[in-house]
Amino acid sequence: MLLLGIESSCDETGVALVETHGSALPQLRSHALHSQIAMHQAYGGVVPELASRDHIRRVLPLTEAVMAEAGRSLAEIDVVAYTRGPGLAGALLVGAGVACALGAALGKPVLGVHHLEGHLLSPFLSADPPEFPFVALLVSGGHTQLMRVDGVGRYELLGETIDDAAGEAFDKSAKLMGLPYPGGPWLAKLAEAGNPAAFKLPRPLLHSGDLDFSFAGLKTAVLTQAKKLGAELEANKADLAASTQAAIVEVLLKKSLAALGQTGLKRLVVAGGVGANRSLREQLNAACAKRGVRVHYPELHLCTDNGAMIAMAAAMRLQSGLAEASERYAFDVKPRWPMASLMASSAAPVAA
């Protein structure tokens, strides 16, 4: 079975081709991605209308490129998958519209996919895919969650952010320091030259006893420190960046280790854009190695939003019998779509 996946939830247009054979793990045949970062930099953030228009310009050329790279024709596609939500409404509608139009033109079914499930299952595209069950740290610009994952569609929420996500903490703190958009990668790069112990910043909910997160207070503390530094901010910017990153990473690390201890599982999956952060990876790898825990990540270029994860999630759902592709082309999107709606709380846990 050949699946085309289309991602257009925010500021990346992604298209990919995944192939399945029976119950074997789906294989990525080709993918293409266009980032809108350069376009949005002038505005200091994503402009939804511009994002939608750019998706319209990019999605069909990317589809043609993906098919050419794989040496396949559109007629060979069996299912067209697309990001149904969550995300920017206009951006989602572009991908959904193109997917449904392609499906109707080819006489092939379509399947809407949850964006976060795409991230969650993206490590299965790596050379070292995980095995169920595992603890998942889903950490991105808009979401921070810890889950127990016993199989496709068998998710138990262990904890989540009660305010800002970790990615927001990176991006908003970077903006307070005057760093360019997107702030997270710039802050991480600057932090390499700084002292992570230079400023004492809060680690919200670090000792709360549960697995929830909170990063709004950290953002406020960074703002307070930046104002306090005043004209000295530029000279101390690397130290402030390093201290901010250290606070975020410590919380993610300690909560992840607590989740592993609580579940007794020995596998951790880290997915989402923040999963590309080098400091987070290094500290998780070191701490988990001491505990005999295997850590799995997506390939670095697949940490960001991409079509491969959408095609993969669709393929794995179809293989698991949890979804049926539809030839009903009257689509709808879900800009707000809680991951909890996919969680089968009644499913019995799988032994580690």
Curated annotation (Swiss-Prot):
| Protein name in UniProt | tRNA N6-adenosine threonylcarbamoyltransferase
What Enzyme Commission number(s) apply to this enzyme?
2.3.1.234
Whichever gene encodes this chain, its name is tsaD
* GO BP terms: tRNA threonylcarbamoyladenosine modification
Reactions accelerated catalytically? L-threonylcarbamoyladenylate + adenosine(37) in tRNA = N(6)-L-threonylcarbamoyladenosine(37) in tRNA + AMP + H(+)
Is-annotated flag, keyword Iron? yes
Pfam families in UniProt: TsaD (PF00814)
Q: Which function does this protein serve?
A: Required for the formation of a threonylcarbamoyl group on adenosine at position 37 (t(6)A37) in tRNAs that read codons beginning with adenine. Is involved in the transfer of the threonylcarbamoyl moiety of threonylcarbamoyl-AMP (TC-AMP) to the N6 group of A37, together with TsaE and TsaB. TsaD likely plays a direct catalytic role in this reaction.
Q: Which SUPFAM superfamilies match?
A: Actin-like ATPase domain
